[in-house]
């Protein structure tokens, strides 16, 4: 076949994928919806809509339902997505463990397990992770219907297009082809993504930023990072990586960061840094509800909520530095909403006003007006970001078309 012929076939396949995705997205977002409404909103020919919906029904991805006509006449036939028969596994790979969750296509959690993964090399970690997923599948075989995808999210530098991991903060990796290893073992479509960016996408699909197309999520945990949603999509840079706001310098004379710089946001607004700051003050003799032998982010937030002055001052201090950095991001991206995630949000009544105060003095007035700063709604759902990657692949047609063809 000539290159021109191959290109023509490729273009036809792409058009099929885009058209199927357009129909599925409308049903997912607005269902119950009629075929006529789908044709009007998608601007596809009614015959094309009929053909695509027939294929989706035959595959079991959508179903017809009766809907009472508004005129009180004959019931109209509408369409909704079918989510119960298709399952995906989402994995949140942490520094020492993995949370593995079974989802249906509505994002409902059907099962969840935590597996310790103390391995410290790329090879042993891959072996242990794949075995943990296999064990999870075996444990929940009775609940599992059609497994359509496995998705893994993790901290580090991830190339989602190649499915390779180039850096992780706790073990040395070298072009780790995790997607290839997963697909070879489990024979399903697999995805890999960055944990914070994937959480930002999950908030857009299912959580605090469902009502807007442009948002920034900032998460404080072992480090500090951001996920940026622009026009409803994850904003990514070269090799799929962007949003390392934890390494913006906020204190030029501050402590040395593990990146080699001094005074990065992460040296102030990370769980360990917050705990160490409170611990140092306690050792200096400052009074607090926080016990010296239990100085954790959880007890610090709890004390701040009860009005403890030391805990509140530290949370406010962290909030001001977060606000300073977020103001820079606001001036760059002009989002419609800011979402804050991490254990520190347990003290949101202290934290969020401190962030907002800084934004109100350092972000452009036109950008900060009517800009909500809210707490994450999904931070407690470890693997929801992994499922968001599966959801995206259904909505953009990549996984959807694969299901239609197989």
Swiss-Prot record:
Gene symbol of the encoding locus: nagC
Keywords in alphabetical order: Activator, Carbohydrate metabolism, DNA-binding, Repressor, Transcription, Transcription regulation
Record-linked Pfam families: MarR (PF01047), ROK (PF00480)
Gene null: resulting phenotype: A double deletion with priB is disadvantageous to cells.
Keyword Transcription regulation part of the UniProt annotation: yes
Segments of the chain annotated as binding DNA: 35-44
Function: Acts as a repressor of the nagEBACD operon and acts both as an activator and a repressor for the transcription of the glmSU operon. Genetic interactions among priB, dam, lexA, nagC, polA, rdgB, rdgB, rep and uup link the PriA-PriB replication restart pathway to DNA double-strand break repair.
Family designation: Belongs to the ROK (NagC/XylR) family.
PANTHER family: N-ACETYLGLUCOSAMINE REPRESSOR (PTHR18964:SF175), ROK (REPRESSOR, ORF, KINASE) FAMILY (PTHR18964)
Superkingdom in the source lineage: Bacteria
GO biological process, one term: regulation of DNA-templated transcription
Induction cue: By N-acetylglucosamine.
Cross-referenced InterPro entries: ATPase_NBD, HTH_MarR-typ, ROK, ROK_cs, WH-like_DNA-bd_sf, WH_DNA-bd_sf
SUPFAM superfamilies, alphabetized: Actin-like ATPase domain, Winged helix' DNA-binding domain
A molecular-function term among this protein's GO annotations: DNA-binding transcription factor activity
Record protein name field: DNA-binding transcriptional dual regulator NagC
